[in-house]
Regions:
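Post-Walker A alpha-helix
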Residues: 18-19
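Extreme N-terminal starter segment of soluble prokaryotic enzymes
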Residues: 1-5
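Sparse, context-dependent recognition of short Cys/His-centered cofactor- or disulfide-binding micro-motifs
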Residues: 7, 26, 53
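P-loop (Walker A) phosphate-binding loop of NTP-binding proteins
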Residues: 10
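ATP-dependent small-molecule kinase phosphotransfer cores
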Residues: 33-101
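ATP-dependent NMP and nucleoside kinases share a basic, alpha-helical "lid"
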Residues: 25, 29, 87-135
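Conserved lysine of the Walker
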Residues: 15
Length: 135
């Protein structure tokens, strides 16, 4: 088995919670486009903010969030949505893990070959959208 599942939804909707529920029932491994972003800016964040972008608290993440959004957006725009995909693609495909490969942050369908298209058309993956219930 080598099924790839992408989870989409706004920040705080429960994408990682869905991963935790799935991984408790079947062999699953987590992947994230945002982890690639955090790896890329980690040295800068530690030097300028004293924050490890890969292992920060929720409060620290809110401090660096504008930088993450800005940098991530610039890279997406310059590559028509492919920059973070290309960063994660090799790791995902080369990983010999035999179970569900779950990408916990499929967010964009802005460009023709963006994250949703990549998941569905290139990886033959399944997309799950999580909505946060509010009263």
């Amino acid at each position: 088995m080598n099924t790839i599942i992408g989870i989409s939804g706004v920040a705080g909707a429960g994408k990682d919670t869905i991963f935790n529920l799935l991984s408790g029932r079947a062999p699953s491994k987590r992947y994230s486009l945002a982890d690639e972003l955090k790896r890329e800016v980690n040295k800068w964040c530690r030097m300028h903010y004293g924050i490890d972008s890969q292992a920060c608290t929720r409060e620290e993440k809110e401090t660096i969030r504008p930088l993450l959004v800005f940098h991530g957006g610039l890279k997406r725009q310059a590559s028509e949505g492919r920059y973070w995909i290309e960063k994660l693609k090799d790791r995902l495909i080369k990983d010999k893990f035999n179970g569900f490969k779950i990408i916990t942050d499929i967010r964009y369908d802005e460009y023709e070959n963006d994250e949703v298209s990549w998941l569905k058309n290139e990886l033959n993956g399944i997309l799950i959208h999580v909505s946060q219930y509010t009263d």
